[in-house]
């Protein structure tokens, strides 16, 4: 068996992509539906089925409350941080634990990590089908501006999906890696502008002799293509209410129709100046059914979304400033993510950087390609490439007066480790509470709490005397580990930051087992579907043969075939694999017997045999060519066939 591959997965808000290194080059893998991108959508049906990807998307309008999309916008977040997202989804978002998030469906409650894991399992299966071998290792990408909790939650999703996450890397960095993979001898400074379905990132990198060094990163994890869709949706709802007096925002299935229509309109407006939005039978009142029929121009779309486009400007300017560069210093601007196709977005990029953006990369696939390259580096398949990423946000602890004291500044190259000595704030203090923070604000309360832990057993001493060394360690995944040590006694307390909105180890293990069980169930379901499809094909073929055979087969055989076709169709409806396989065997035998008879009737010499040959009489049959005492015997025309000359 060949060496195990490390696949690269772009786990996107809207779509996901999987890639792998083959023969020294990255290959984007098609899924079972023949597409290179897979919708990041999971649905639970009334029959108990779990649908992933395009199949889930296809039934979303009729099953809106059980179809989970854009789960990435909730991953690693607390419920009070998801208010804007919750307003615009068709499914129910509820509290998980103290502060976390879950999705409520007819099949049960699921965390964003579990939903993301289902998508990752689809990516894993896609890679395994392509490679013909089991896959257990992956590099998964995240938005550069994801905080520690979001990174940890993404890694947990990978574990639930049965993957060892070898590395979490930032999406813009992965894109730069893909862009510069064949340009190792080029020294340049590039900006990667990444506007995806749910997040926005801007990263400034320097490429030199195969070294990809991130100089700075910035972004907005509440901004993406979904927000552009929402702007169109809100306009449609408002316009329809003005026209009819009816509010169509309450019905979940209607909202799903509006969402899909808005997304379609957004895509069309990237290539045309106006688009027609037509949704028949959108609702009804006492006067009858109502239809939504509107024209949206690009000018109106630009007006509706101007504030969203403008929100990307300041992060770009901040990233340039943090990198110590001017816009004129940037050699190339790489566009990543589906939303960069919006003309107003491209125009803003041109204004900010003073140059036309580079459109040479596929914005939908480039991130997964970069992840595959990093997987190749970790697997030893790729050499002469070094990736130096950064932490997007500053890290520190709360100190006296509620101030945040930073230990690691944002845009510090990772992995990194830094220590600082603190002391007690009161006499005879026997314990210190370490409040770990992430953010850029001066006051602790204005930043994000990553976790808290206590160092106890400090010997009594006047305040300021004990020496407490706090160490922050950020690994290559951007995940934080913190320790506190009393230098006087040597006592130490270490933690890996686990957020209140995250998952415990027990919860992760339970979800891993659930996912494995679902994988087995999904495999069994797939086998049933394949068997049903095969039986359906056999049934159709037999029915066609019987209809075309005419009088070449007898009435008894026709009835036998008709009865078997009926039993086969009942088996198809049963979803019972054993019954389906039995029906396949029966119908195959009948089909073979009938086909043989039809063939023998149609074969050269069959007509001669039926007429009794040149010197004989026709055999008794329903045609009446021969009757009692040989009456009505007719001469048959025939041709002598010499088999030796055939």
From Swiss-Prot:
Protein known as: Chaperone protein DnaK
Gene: dnaK
Organism whose genome encodes this protein: Leptospira interrogans serogroup Icterohaemorrhagiae serovar Lai (strain 56601)
Record's compositionally biased regions (Low complexity): 600-621
HAMAP family: DnaK (MF_00332)
SUPFAM superfamilies xref list: Actin-like ATPase domain, Heat shock protein 70kD (HSP70), C-terminal subdomain, Heat shock protein 70kD (HSP70), peptide-binding domain
Induction: By stress conditions e.g. heat shock.
Start and end residues of each stretch annotated as Disordered: 598-646
CDD domains for this protein: ASKHA_NBD_HSP70_DnaK-like (cd10234)
Gene3D superfamilies the UniProt entry points to: 1.20.1270.10, 3.30.420.40, Actin, Chain A, domain 4 (3.90.640.10), Substrate Binding Domain Of DNAk, Chain A, domain 1 (2.60.34.10)
Function: Acts as a chaperone.
GO biological process: chaperone cofactor-dependent protein refolding; protein refolding
Pfam families: HSP70 (PF00012)
Phosphothreonine: residues carrying this PTM: 199
Similarity-based family: Belongs to the heat shock protein 70 family.
